[in-house]
């Protein structure tokens, strides 16, 4: 990938190696006047992601290439410091949309190579692209328009045929997914947070104004780690190629739909099952999702026990009566823990700052003491010096007087 493409697609895998080769330290990126343009542009792309579209103007000079490339890691630092899940999703979406506009102008060969960076193995013939249906489902599942459903696509020997425009749209989803997964950034140094604080305050103020315009789901991002044991067990079996009983398949599917997973995402989970049939499975999932007008809810714990699907019961299970209640409680506890951790970090940071302030004050007082001691010693030395000077003067005067007296004595004799 040449420097121009690196600047346009800074989230590509090989860009990190290029940035490392520039030998620009984090401290330099944050503080050096040489990278002021990168910081300004980084803040600009973050603010533009809130306001509407991230605009990129291709200039093709060395200065622009450097500032545009380094503006991305600076923007990432700002997004990480904001630490808001909805904002992160918004930023990732707008970066992906901005990139897709440039991808539309790229050659077929470049698009195929670019797709490989995201694990998409595709082929192209004339103006059409073909890709494996699993890759198609992975990146199309978050697109809600009916035209993107697998049943509405041309399928040939497990390969989905799409136009160049649609292939670029899928690449956009791949970019969005990669950027979202790059957050949160663990353990941001306190000095970085302090430096970014004014930027972050401005970003948060702007985001709060626009927040109501952005959509979100009831549960937010789906978090499989927080699923109840019964659903986690079912998922592990499905991914291991084990064929689930009908009642467990229904329970798992209805649960996943309820927490925000799309039909195509769930379909992709079942594609390793020994009896997998894409059309039949898709029909079953859509039926549970409400294709016939009746949306099915996941069964309660009592029903799960009746059918022998209550597996791996833990302590939290004793306090709830529905798998969704388990998931809600886990999300609450995680958010509470995160909030407490944040408060703890803020408290530790505050204590650290106070200790630093006390230390600085102590050092300041020590400096004052040293200065006073030095001044006292200098004053004492000065007095001693002046005393010795007076003694020498008196001694000299005494000798002069004695000499004069001797001369007068001689004259009298």
Curated annotation (Swiss-Prot):
One of its GO terms (biological process) is DNA replication, synthesis of primer. The gene is priL. It comes from Methanosarcina barkeri (strain Fusaro / DSM 804). Residues 340-356, 362-381, 388-413 have a biased composition (Basic and acidic residues). NCBIfam families: PRK02249.1-2 (NF002588). [4Fe-4S] cluster binds at residues 230, 301, 310, 317. Belongs to the eukaryotic-type primase large subunit family. This is DNA primase large subunit PriL. GO terms for cellular component: primosome complex. PANTHER family: DNA PRIMASE LARGE SUBUNIT.
